[in-house]
Amino acid sequence: KGAESVGAETEYFNLYDLVLKGCRSCLACKLKTKTKGRCYWRDDLTEVIDKILDADCLLIGSPIYFGQPTSEFRALVERLIFCVMSYDDGSSYFSGKVNVGIFYTMNAPLEFYEQSMKESLATTEYLFSFLNGEIVTYPVCDTIQVSDYSKFNMAGFSQELKEKQWILQFPDDLEKAFEIG
């Protein structure tokens, strides 16, 4: 919504709705032919990658499971970045510039993210540097996972505390996401 509010054209893709695979390390993107810098494999991710490489900005989000983004997110990063990464000198074959905003949602509190997750997620942020743009990361922490915790084996969480945190923090998270957009 933030990008649209300043006149940007936007397009939304839900990776869960696509039939896709991660990088197969076929190295066709490293051939000194027409496939250099482009992923050879064709699936639903092909159009997404092409549109990202033609865009000015990529806003991407993923929940964090077991300390990492989803497999679909990883598949996109593999296919998008590996094909533009030069094995000659470590530079980028990509001559354009795509600014990237990364949004992570997680059940963990912000303190845990800062102490235990931020550093491991920095690798993903580094990979986006091959798109030659600015990179902004925003963690949305201590999220509500379900509307009624009593229906689940989740006694380790207090629904009351989760809801209080959401009331305090979620409006700020929305505002920040809008600004980044």
Indicate residue ranges for each PLM-predicted region:
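Membrane-targeting and insertion segments and their boundary/processing signals
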Residues: T46-D50, V98, S147-K151
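Beta-strand-loop-alpha "switch" segments that mediate conformational coupling across diverse proteins
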Residues: V136-S147
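N-terminal beta1-alpha1-beta2 submodule of the flavodoxin-like/Rossmannoid cofactor-binding fold
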Residues: K1-D89, M154-G181
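Short aromatic-enriched loop/helix-cap "lid" or pocket-rim segments at secondary-structure transitions
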Residues: C23-C26, E114-Q115, S147-F152
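Short, glycine-/small-residue-rich phosphate/pyrophosphate-handling segment
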Residues: S71-E72, M85-Y138
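Short, glycine/serine-rich, charged loops/turns that create anion-binding
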Residues: D17, N107-A108, D142
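Short catalytic/ligand-binding loop motif for oxyanion handling, primarily in non-cytosolic enzymes
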Residues: G67-P69, L110-E111, V146-S147
